[in-house]
Amino acid sequence: MDASEEAKRVSIQVTSLSTQLIESVDKQSHLEEQLNKSLKTIASQKAAIENYNQLKEDYNTLKRELSDRDDEVKRLREDIAKENELRTKAEEEADKLNKEVEDLTASLFDEANNMVADARKEKYAIEILNKRLTEQLREKDTLLDTLTLQLKNLKKVMHSLDNESTVTNNSNRYSTILSDSATSSSTSLNKVPTSYSLASQDIYSGIVYSPSISSIRYDISLYNEFLKFVAALPRCENIKATSTESKLIRRLVNDEIQPILKIDNASGIGWLVKKTLLSLIIDGLVVVEPLSGVNATYQIGYNSSSPAKQATSNMPKMFKFPLDSPPVAVHAACSFCGESRDDIIEHARMYILKTLHKTDDGKEQVTNTYPLCHWCLLKLRQTCEIFAFLRSLKVGAWHLEKLTTQNITKEDLEKFSEVTKHTKRDGRVSSQDKKTKRLSFMAGLGINSSTKNKPKMEIFSSETNAKPGQPTTNIQRAWLQLCKLRCILHWTHIGIWAVDDSISSKIGPLVEDDSDEDQNDAISVRLQDKALWKQDAKRPFSSSSAEESQKSDAFDFESGDMENEITGESSSDESSSDGSSTDNSTADSSSEDESSLADSTTSSADSSSPESIDNGEGDDTVTKDDKSSIKSANNNEENSDCGDKKGRSIIKKKAPQRKIQKKKLLQDLDDLEEQFREESAIDQTEFENAESNVKQNISSKRASSGDENSKKDNNEKTLKTNLTIGDKTQEQIGENSPSSGLHASSSNDDNFDDAQEQQ
């Protein structure tokens, strides 16, 4: 029994020892795994330490470079101070030289004035001598005239004495001469036209009807619509867009153009084109041209030399066909009125109407062509002239006065409807003048002629020289031009062969010349006769801008003799004073803009200084504050100069804060380095202690199994404590590793650099 119990006890002990052995082997394997892990962590920490050392070296090099740059900045500031001193000295010297130059110029001007005065004195003396000489010459001329008269009288006396001997012979001859002269006079009287025949010829060669310019009215509703049209032009893209504020185009189309053209009754035009033709004419997308250039030589009023001479000349050919060739026409009927006669040239369809369409590229393409007779040609051309004139007002070729729809009051309407009035006696003749003219037909033989004949002085002014009823503003002149074009349109509807036959005046705008010394005096463009306009047409018309002249090439805005207007001096003075005030305001605004630009450049220069670059190492809060300060500074720069100063003060206040934050960051980096070193040393000591404990446990197990059983619990406790300590240290190392701190600082540096770039 005892042996069996001992065997059981031994077997139990063996099993327990085997289990302990297995557990110890497992623990040993587990410890070896932990050892490998710890070795790996140590290797990874060594790489991190190397990266940290390299970054530290880079930081030191950057710090040195910054110090070098600071030294350079100081040196440059010293150089700037020296240059400023030199500049002040140079400015002082320049001021001295300017004063000397001013003194020299003053002395030169004094000498020049003295020379001019001497020259004028000499000129005055020479003029007096010339006057005396001219008077002497006149006296000599009168003497010569008297002597020549005396000689003529003497010659007559001599001839009379010579002819006394032959009086008898000359008497017969004289009778025959009288008979011949009588017959010739009778025949000539028969040939001379009477006053009645001359009057009849003048009547049938004159103008049918043409109203004078002074009879044009400015108090009708259509003129008010014209003023609204002028006021709405600057705000609209084209003249069709003015229909919302003015009824001018609508009334012109409905009351005058549509009844004359009768597009709805046109047989040769499609219904789609009928709807869009007037809008195309308003936009200027219509072309009226002859089928051949030779057709222009067959129109009424065309004057040219003989075609044979032109054919034999060496001049270049203007037309495809020779000048003596017949005109080119179309057999098709007119698209508007249906004219189909071919009996005379005037009834032929020698012209065509082309409708255009604008492509996406801005080019114009021909969509339709329609033949035109002479009657419809004049009507269409005149409608195109009317809308081209309205488009020229939109371009600004007529230099219209500024007018707004809100300011169209009764006073403004009176201002733009005023015309020139009589300023003298309207050509009336006094009763005393009539008496003197009745009493004698010879000059100076009337009653009290010596007392009645008084010297007259001519006053050259627009008020005295201008006829009554003339326009005083460019808006009135534009209205006159529109009335003239409308009148021609009505005459084309009545039926005429030519348009330019009865045009006796050309109307143009008032043009202000900036080169004149007196800018308040306006220059008026006078209405002139056709003969004067032809003489003055050779002179070029000076427009205010090249673009307006290019756009208004189809119209004649040529002016004749220019006269200064005195009637609008008060308005011109007010406008000039307003213009000067606006000029001053614009100059002040421009100076403020320049100062704001200068301040913005200085603020940008301050922000890009090396001090701001040095302060680029900050956290996220620093970058957000910088962005907000930059935005506020930019807003203040755009608003006013005071805002610029505030923005610069904000940026300057941020600079010391950045320096403090930089120092804090450097201290934090140093603390992290010390903590990392201490923790790594502690980890190494703890790991070595754990290794020694494991080795001691293994040796003790191999030496004696009994001792292992007794020390089992103690070894397990120590191993657990060591493992927990190692895990905690690894977690702390992972949390406090330098890589994470460096990444955070680098991200903050990037954010700060972005903020600096924005600033």
Swiss-Prot record:
Residues 704-719 have a biased composition (Basic and acidic residues). Residues 690-703, 731-744 have a biased composition (Polar residues). Interacts with SEC4. Interacts with YPT32, preferentially in its GTP-bound form. The modification N-acetylmethionine is found at residue 1. It is found in: Bud neck; Bud tip; Cytoplasmic vesicle, Secretory vesicle. Keywords: Acetylation, Coiled coil, Cytoplasmic vesicle, Guanine-nucleotide releasing factor, Phosphoprotein, Protein transport, Transport. The N-terminal domain (1-374) is sufficient for the exchange factor activity. It comes from Saccharomyces cerevisiae (strain ATCC 204508 / S288c). Disulfide bonds: none annotated. The modification Phosphoserine is found at residues 171, 515. Belongs to the SEC2 family. It comes from the Eukaryota. One of its GO terms (molecular function) is identical protein binding. Guanine nucleotide exchange factor for SEC4, catalyzing the dissociation of GDP from SEC4 and also potently promoting binding of GTP. Activation of SEC4 by SEC2 is needed for the directed transport of vesicles to sites of exocytosis. Binds the Rab GTPase YPT32, but does not have exchange activity on YPT32. It holds the Pfam family Sec2p. Residues 648-664 have a biased composition (Basic residues). GO terms for cellular component: cell tip; cellular bud neck; cellular bud tip; cytosol; mating projection tip; transport vesicle. Residues 555-576, 750-759 have a biased composition (Acidic residues). InterPro entries: RAB3IL/RAB3IP/Sec2 (IPR040351), Sec2_N (IPR009449). Residues 577-589, 597-612 have a biased composition (Low complexity). GO terms for biological process: ascospore-type prospore membrane formation; autophagy; exocytosis; protein transport; sporulation resulting in formation of a cellular spore. This is Rab guanine nucleotide exchange factor SEC2. Residues 26-164, 651-682, 732-759 form a coiled coil. Residues 538-759 are annotated as: Disordered. Present with 13200 molecules/cell in log phase SD medium. Residues 451-508 are annotated as: Required for proper polarized localization of the protein. The modification Phosphothreonine is found at residue 168.
